[in-house]
A protein has these predicted regions:
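Active-site acidic catalytic loop and adjacent metal/ATP-binding pocket
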Residues: 53-100
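Active-site cores enriched in adjacent His and Asp/Glu residues with nearby glycine-rich loops
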Residues: 42, 67-69, 141
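A structural signal for short hydrophobic/aromatic patches embedded in well-ordered alpha helices
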Residues: 48, 128, 145-146
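Regulatory N- and C-terminal appendages and interdomain linkers associated
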Residues: 176-180
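All-alpha amphipathic helical-bundle segments outside canonical DNA-binding/catalytic cores
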Residues: 140-150
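Active-site activation/catalytic loop segments of kinase-like enzymes and analogous catalytic loops
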Residues: 99-136, 153-168
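A cross-family kinase active-site recognition segment
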Residues: 1-43, 63-65, 173
């Protein structure tokens, strides 16, 4: 949380703007581009459309924003002795809500695998938020929006993985992440 907050404070001073290509506004076109009929996830389409509609209805307006990394997933960060030691892959960096970044982190880093299920780890969320707030305070408006921001972040990653799964040729030399 601390390094993310520091990154947000530093980038807030930059006079740069780049639209977040994976913002909530981009999820509907992404959803429409998934070939549901041709893969084993065809029953998800209705569920995903309804969820996106609901997320859009409750998506917050005018939260504090600036440049975010936009992809703080486990394969883009390094830890040394349980401390964040490095961040890479700024391909998806762009302007969006700072709390959307925290929602991405919650989705990526605050679950534990128990058997075959991922279980939310509230202590990890608490540590992430406390670390962030030790550097940059989170407003009550931001805190009240975190649930819908987390839903949006989760949907974003599910949709990108479904897109890759349904649209990438089998001969492509890339590793496709399992949408499950």
């Amino acid at each position: 949380g601390k390094i993310t907050a520091r990154m947000h404070l530093v980038t807030k001073k930059l006079k740069l703007y780049r639209k977040n290509s994976m913002s909530i506004k981009n999820l509907n076109p992404l959803l429409k581009s998934i070939k549901f009929k041709s893969n084993k996830f065809s029953k998800l389409e209705f569920f995903l459309k309804n969820n996106l509609k609901d997320i859009n209805r409750y998506w917050p307006k005018n939260l504090p924003n600036g440049i975010i990394h936009g992809d703080l997933f486990i394969d883009n960060i390094f830890f040394k002795k349980n401390k964040l030691s490095g961040i890479l892959d700024f391909y998806f960096a762009g302007n969006d809500y700072f709390m959307y970044e925290i929602a991405i982190c919650i989705n990526a880093l605050c679950f534990d695998l128990k058997g075959k299920k991922f279980i939310i780890n509230k202590q990890k969320i608490k540590s992430l938020i406390e670390g962030y707030e030790s550097v940059k305070k989170i407003s009550s408006r931001e805190k009240s929006a975190i649930n819908v921001l987390c839903r949006g972040a989760a949907l974003r990653y599910l949709l990108t993985r479904l897109y890759d799964y349904s649209n990438t040729p089998k001969t492509a030399l890339i590793k496709i992440k399992n949408p499950n």
